[in-house]
Amino acid sequence: MEKIKVKIKGKEYEVEKGTPLGKIFELAGIKDALGGVINGKIIDLQTPVRESGEIKPVYRGSKESLEIMRHSLAHIMAQALKELYGAKKVHLGVGPTTEEGFYYDVEVEGHKITEEDLPKIEQKMKEIIERDYPILRRELSREEAIKLFDKLKEKYKIDIIKEIPEEEVISVYEQGDFIDLCKGPHLPSTGKAGAFKLTSISGAYWKGRSDQPQLTRIYGIAYWSDKEVKERLKFYEEVKKRDHRRLGKELEFFTIDDNVGAGLILWLPRGAIYRKVLEDYLREEHLKRGYQLVYTPHVGKSKLWETSGHLECYKQNMFPSMKIDEEEYYVKPMNCPFHIAIYKSRTRSYKELPLKLFELGTVYRYELSGVLHGLLRVRGFTQDDAHIVCTPEQVNDVIRETLDFALSTLKDFGFNEFKIYLSTRPEYSIGSDEQWEVSQNALKKAIEDLGYEYEIDEGGGAFYGPKIDVKIRDAIGRMWQLSTIQFDFNLPERFDMTYVGPDNKKHRPYMIHRALLGSIERFTGILLEHYAGLLPIWLSPTQVMIIPIADRHHEYAKKVYEFLKENGIRAEMDLREERMNAKIRDAELKKIPVILVVGDREAQNNTVSVRTKKEGNLGSMELNKFLDWIKEKIKNKE
């Protein structure tokens, strides 16, 4: 029998290949472990160990133990569903873990599961935990597995089995009379599960494809203690309140129409005003920093995408081709090849570099319908996309200026807490050692020169170049990846990009892809959730709502409105026959940042009574003074 060597807590053991982890732990005197980590992979006590390496025991309370426990809770939920609605009537899809819990995609014959069913499902899960079933692992041949799940009427499991590579082990886990196809890891028994709560239900297409059946996805969260679960539920309530999909509808920012297509955003008038302000800001800031604005088509010939490598490496994310004049065209998934075509439209001299091209470029990418999510995951979106072409000598200055631009932009939107990640050369890469050294050093130096800390993602760069990613922390503590600064050693070669140097010879330039916000759509979703819909004054579609106390104050309200409008302030009037307090409440619900109340005293003194959601009642201000006040707020990006 073949032997392997494993190291546990500094001591080496020689065991037979395929010995279950639990047996190895017995040999090593390890007690109370729920599983282990070997060569970066979490496995449970029943999993055969087939490779040498160091094993780190996993105990209750650790991050890895949550992965094991949450996986078992997904199975416990599936078993509960079968007990409640009939084993042969519940067909199981997939049931993975998530960052905070688990979900299972299921199809239930004759019953539509709703959120009202969740307490009943939870109760049944608690019963299964109380029974403390041992969780047992078995390995099957492909034929045995198909036969088993055919008998269990589990058509989706058979689908999965057929797609498992020939060389991969097929395993099932059993608890009581429940059995499921699964790689693991799992707890030793159901009784070892921690605290959990089922949180929501959604629809999910099988395999994420709209041409497949729609299943019911049931989500749960799980931690080791009730206290942690309660804290997360409180957090989820806050997340729900801030959901950009709800806010987008309430604030009339955007909509999605089935007849137009999933993942394709329709910007409504209020959202369009906000978007214009955002895009105007971006254009102005880019022009200030020496970028040149460009516009490019939404489609390009297949030859372009062949040269760029997209058809070879990215076709699954592209929309199907269309034929025009006997030639194939594709809608663009990226702007880069078009910007390169602009660069190559004439011979470039080193004196023109760095050349910085900027476009608010709309791109289209095929995403599975199951992953689409409001503005955060779409099929058509507009990137704040720039490409910088420079000489090797200019790289340090260019990267420092670009990172500074990214961070100052994010600060303008109210984000002040960043995490910066530097991703370095992977095992497989293109480009010379010199290119990688120059670019990685430039990225590192830029971060250090600007005084920021960073984490190195060793080997995490793309095969064509290293990059910086900037993540921001939002108002409720979530991290979002926004800015990217990415070197590319691939496209300059593919497109034969050159510049004429001082020696009058052609040289290959460095090229940098750069996005500050990522995309207008996703950034808007993040911004709406960060501010819970109450955007800063400078970004709000309506900055001021004017509310007259009575009908006789309408004329003065109109005068204030015209004055503000003439001075570039986006204002509205509420002239409805409603009580003043009702109008104020409506303005607050519409997330209008500044409310002006006008009555007899204001009309006589040419003043306005000012209140804001953030600062409360600011009292009376002379009209010109108010204009100065709000312009200062706008100037300071408040």
UniProtKB/Swiss-Prot annotation:
One of its GO terms (cellular component) is cytoplasm. It is found in: Cytoplasm. It comes from the Bacteria. Residues 243-536 are annotated as: Catalytic. Its EC number is 6.1.1.3. CDD domains: ThrRS_anticodon (cd00860), ThrRS_core (cd00771). Binds 1 zinc ion per subunit. Its main location: cytoplasm. The keyword Oxidoreductase does not apply. Residues 1-59 form the TGS domain. SUPFAM superfamilies: Class II aaRS ABD-related, Class II aaRS and biotin synthetases, ThrRS/AlaRS common domain. InterPro entries: aa-tRNA-synt_IIb (IPR002314), aa-tRNA-synth_II (IPR006195), aa-tRNA-synth_II/BPL/LPL (IPR045864), Anticodon-bd (IPR004154), Anticodon-bd_dom_sf (IPR036621), TGS (IPR004095), Thr-tRNA-ligase_IIa (IPR002320), Thr/Ala-tRNA-synth_IIc_edit (IPR018163). Its cofactor is Zn(2+). It catalyses: tRNA(Thr) + L-threonine + ATP = L-threonyl-tRNA(Thr) + AMP + diphosphate + H(+). GO terms for biological process: threonyl-tRNA aminoacylation. Signal peptide: none annotated. One of its GO terms (molecular function) is threonine-tRNA ligase activity. Keywords: Aminoacyl-tRNA synthetase, ATP-binding, Cytoplasm, Ligase, Metal-binding, Nucleotide-binding, Protein biosynthesis, RNA-binding, tRNA-binding, Zinc. Zn(2+) binds at residues 336, 387, 513. Gene3D superfamilies: 3.30.54.20, Anticodon-binding domain, Bira Bifunctional Protein, Domain 2, Threonyl-trna Synthetase, Chain A, domain 2. Homodimer. Belongs to the class-II aminoacyl-tRNA synthetase family. Catalyzes the attachment of threonine to tRNA(Thr) in a two-step reaction: L-threonine is first activated by ATP to form Thr-AMP and then transferred to the acceptor end of tRNA(Thr). Also edits incorrectly charged L-seryl-tRNA(Thr). This is Threonine--tRNA ligase. The gene is thrS.
